[in-house]
Amino acid sequence: MAFKQLLTAISIVSVANAALTRRVACPDGVNTATNAVCCSLFAVRDLIQDQLFDGGECGEEVHESLRLTFHDAIGISPTIASTGVFGGGGADGSIAIFAEIETNFHANNGVDEIIGEQAPFIQMTNMTTADFIQFAGAVGVSNCPGAPALPVFVGRPDATQPAPDKTVPEPFDTVDSILARFADAGGFSSAEVVALLASHTIAAADHVDPSIPGTPFDSTPEIFDTQFFIETQLRGILFPGTGGNQGEVESPLHGEIRLQSDSELARDSRTACEWQSFVNNQAKIQSAFKAAFRKMTILGHSESSLIECSEVIQTPPALEGNAHLPAGQTMNDIEQACATTPFPSLSADPGPATSVAPVPPS
């Protein structure tokens, strides 16, 4: 009797699992999905790959779309809400819906450009602005060699109020302030903060030093690799542009800009070892960033209220090449900050000292 009951239970579980994994044919006659709601996203993906991301490049629009996912989602503060004032809705599209307000926040300088570029595509789809911003970021990152395939959720309602100012961390903020802001926004640990900053491996600054727009944070801004975590540990010796800009400190390479916040997080005792742990560890940077992005992309929402459509995201190209010191650098140029683990031994690229080219505009 017990054995028969066990077989019956196994059969029920098998049927349930089959139901959960059964795919539906999408109306396009090409794709299938685990949820019919996801079917429309394939066409949106192909549209923005072609017309927003220049046929699938990991370029400026990808960098800016990823930045926008964060600037929208981090706009939430339970601490502010506890005072009886609206604390923001997280990933709710408010940064675009109330662009005339939020783009005037100092921390959001420059996001108006990608908001303007995305606006026509939002109008062409049935997606909420909240969903589109996060979706576009995930689609764009899939163009970058070495990146993880990021999770996608839909079902977020759009914002009805703007986020409060000063919820987006600034590059001149202290480590204390940055860690506190992330903890308030979504209970992010210091390790998760470091993981989210992996986004800077495919990023550039336009407004920290306005004289040199498109200046990358590492020497490979078109590749999702660990060079950002290596190069922020190199001794800073120069400013790539004018110098003396708020939130900027000296960088190790011509053409590369270093944020004060990145420099300090790389050297703070609470984050230095986690920072160093990403060096030459592609599997970790992928898994940690994917997990932290998943948490960030649903801020202000419960995951159970959303539908996951991660299958729509294409597998990013594989990473080629190895972690390295830029040409002209040696291990003596590393500023060891982790007190418990030696910095991984790396060889330098051959040739003359590395000079980093700006990210070209679209």
Curated annotation (Swiss-Prot):
The gene is mnp3. One of its GO terms (cellular component) is extracellular region. Ca(2+) 1 binds at residues 72, 90, 92, 94. It comes from Phlebia radiata. SUPFAM superfamilies: Heme-dependent peroxidases (SSF48113). It catalyses: 2 Mn(2+) + H2O2 + 2 H(+) = 2 Mn(3+) + 2 H2O. This is Manganese peroxidase 3. Heme b binds at residue 200. Binds 1 heme b (iron(II)-protoporphyrin IX) group per subunit. Binds 2 calcium ions per subunit. The record marks 67 as: Transition state stabilizer.
